[in-house]
């Protein structure tokens, strides 16, 4: 018969508690952070594609938003249905417009991992793209369910830059809306 020492139980419990706390920090949710700004994207200035909200636990400006130590989250609420092919096409088109082929090659593997997690959306669905500046994980969620989490500060900078970069963002009116007064 084996006896379990109380000290062993305390150490085991402390270890489990520490792991659970680290996990919750690694996947910190935008719901815990204040909304910094919001905007919308329209196709041909008439058809609303989505509303987007930017969340962060720290002060965000246009100058620091893509710093790799700044945690942030984009919540994208879709007003239309979109296929995975349309997501891939839009992502690749904007990234090619913003970055050199050499840079895109340097993030190719994590980008492919992220894109392989894409799911089609229906009107009313929500994608969250969150980045934790402490552990450098970018996380993609659909309707609050994790699709993928990747450790890559460079991927996060490029991917979130689709909306947040000064350099040819997906929509200049959206960018201006997100960063007015910032």
Residue ranges, per PLM feature:
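Terminal leader/tail segments of proteins
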Residues: 27-182
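Bacterial N-terminal signal peptides that target proteins for export
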Residues: 2-14
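N-terminal signal peptide c-region/cleavage motif recognized by signal peptidases
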Residues: 23-25
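Hydrophobic core
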Residues: 17-21
């Amino acid at each position: 018969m084996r006896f379990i020492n109380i000290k062993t139980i305390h150490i085991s419990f402390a270890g489990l508690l520490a792991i659970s706390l680290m996990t919750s920090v690694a996947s910190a949710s935008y719901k815990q952070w204040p909304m910094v700004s919001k905007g919308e994207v329209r196709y041909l200035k008439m058809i609303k594609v989505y509303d987007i909200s930017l969340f962060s636990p720290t002060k965000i400006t246009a100058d620091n938003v893509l710093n790799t130590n700044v945690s942030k989250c984009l919540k994208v609420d879709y007003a239309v249905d979109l296929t995975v092919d349309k997501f891939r096409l839009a992502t690749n088109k904007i990234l090619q417009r913003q970055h050199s082929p050499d840079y895109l090659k340097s993030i190719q593997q994590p980008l492919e991992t992220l894109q392989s997690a894409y799911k089609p959306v229906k009107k009313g669905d929500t994608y969250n793209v969150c980045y934790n500046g402490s552990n450098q994980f970018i996380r993609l969620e659909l309707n609050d369910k994790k699709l993928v989490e990747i450790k890559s500060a460079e991927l996060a900078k490029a991917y979130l830059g689709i909306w947040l970069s000064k350099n040819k963002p997906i929509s200049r009116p959206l960018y201006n809306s997100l960063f007015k007064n910032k």
